[in-house]
């Protein structure tokens, strides 16, 4: 006779089971994102829906043109990078562009980083890119911390990743933890404003984490430098193949590293949430107690066998004046008794 599946049985822990669960979670996540996107689109006005459709068509056309004319596009980028290198004040212009793109909701950080690699090479463009990025991020952090705090809080609430990392940083705002978060694949400018809304996070810790993680910009510089070499007509075919392989390997290694770090952070977040729920189960949740009420229990709240006095016992004994416990004290005492019984039960399970 076949054995029926029990809900109490532990889930499968094999490799294929983990892969299946991971694929199921990813599929469910994509389905939720699709539903959210559809709901957001349907909530827009008719004019905005038309504009969104036009923008989608334009994006598709641009993507097709890039695939067809990518060779000419790369050659154009090479020409622009050569002219930029000869431009008076070119370093200052690129510095200011990277500096201000650190303010949300501006975009273009990755493109500017690649441009720095194409113009100034690898690793010679790192001092310019790192100084502009670190200073811009720090100034954006200070602006959103002291002047645009409400906008930063909205950024946190608008993104699930930001909410998750904010929950972790409220419990542990150490430099090491922030370094791991800065290495995660988060939107560059938006993360600067969102992290500023966490009061437990020190500005100096944020600056230190930005400086420590600045070497990751070498990846953008390397890719930009190789793209320029790939578009150079003087480069032979074998060198171009090596450049393409190096770009793919570098991108895959960087993506794998950030994915591993992100997974570790997700596991830490899950562990923290599970620990909080377990503590609430064992010790109760005191959020529902009225604020400002000081409850003190004394020996009058218990009988000679250390059992909590009930309401009926109070009604019987209050006329004699032997006990003075209030209703609030009795309620808290009952709650303490239930917690004690829960703890005892867990100790013997």
From Swiss-Prot:
Keyword Nucleus belongs to the record = no
Ranges for the region named VTT domain are 117-227
Q: Note the InterPro entries from the entry.
A: Golgi_membrane_TVP38/TMEM64 (IPR051076), VTT_dom (IPR032816)
The UniProt transmembrane annotation reads 50-70, 92-112, 124-144, 193-213, 241-261
**This protein's name:** Golgi apparatus membrane protein TVP38
UniProt keywords (A-Z) are: Glycoprotein, Golgi apparatus, Membrane, Transmembrane, Transmembrane helix
Q: What is its main location?
A: Golgi
Q: In UniProt terms, what function does this protein have?
A: Golgi membrane protein involved in vesicular trafficking and spindle migration.
Q: Could you tell me which species this protein originates from?
A: Meyerozyma guilliermondii (strain ATCC 6260 / CBS 566 / DSM 6381 / JCM 1539 / NBRC 10279 / NRRL Y-324)
Topology with regard to the membrane? Multi-pass membrane protein
């Amino acid at each position: 006779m076949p054995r029926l599946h029990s809900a109490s049985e532990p889930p499968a822990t094999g490799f294929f089971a983990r892969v299946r669960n991971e694929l199921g979670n990813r599929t469910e996540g994509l389905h939720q994102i699709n539903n959210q996107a559809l709901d957001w689109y349907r909530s827009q006005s008719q004019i905005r829906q038309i504009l969104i459709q036009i923008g989608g068509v334009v994006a598709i056309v641009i993507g097709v043109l890039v695939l067809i004319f990518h060779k000419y596009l790369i050659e154009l980028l090479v020409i622009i990078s050569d002219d930029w290198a000869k431009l008076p004040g070119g370093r200052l212009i690129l510095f200011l562009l990277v500096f201000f793109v650190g303010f949300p909701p501006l975009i273009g950080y990755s493109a500017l980083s690649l441009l720095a690699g194409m113009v100034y090479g690898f690793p010679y463009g790192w001092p310019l890119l790192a100084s502009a990025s670190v200073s811009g991020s720090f100034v954006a952090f200070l602006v959103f911390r002291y002047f645009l705090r409400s906008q930063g809080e909205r950024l946190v609430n608008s993104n699930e990743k930001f909410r998750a990392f904010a929950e972790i940083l409220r419990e542990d705002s150490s430099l090491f933890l922030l370094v791991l978060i800065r290495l995660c694949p988060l939107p560059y400018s938006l993360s600067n404003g969102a992290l500023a809304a966490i009061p437990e996070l020190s500005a100096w810790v944020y600056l230190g984490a930005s400086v420590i993680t600045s070497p990751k910009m070498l990846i953008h510089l390397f890719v930009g430098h190789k793209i320029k070499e790939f578009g150079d007509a003087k480069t032979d075919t074998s060198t171009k193949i090596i450049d393409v392989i190096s770009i793919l390997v570098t991108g895959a290694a960087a993506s794998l590293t950030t994915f591993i770090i992100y997974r570790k952070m997700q596991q830490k977040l899950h562990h923290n949430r599970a620990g909080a729920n377990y503590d609430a189960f064992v010790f109760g949740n005191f959020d529902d107690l009225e604020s400002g009420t000081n409850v003190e229990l004394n020996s009058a709240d218990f009988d000679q066998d250390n059992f909590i006095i009930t309401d009926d016992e109070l009604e019987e004994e209050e006329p004699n004046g032997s006990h003075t416990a209030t209703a609030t004290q009795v309620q808290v005492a009952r709650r303490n008794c239930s917690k004690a019984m829960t703890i005892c039960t867990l100790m013997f399970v």
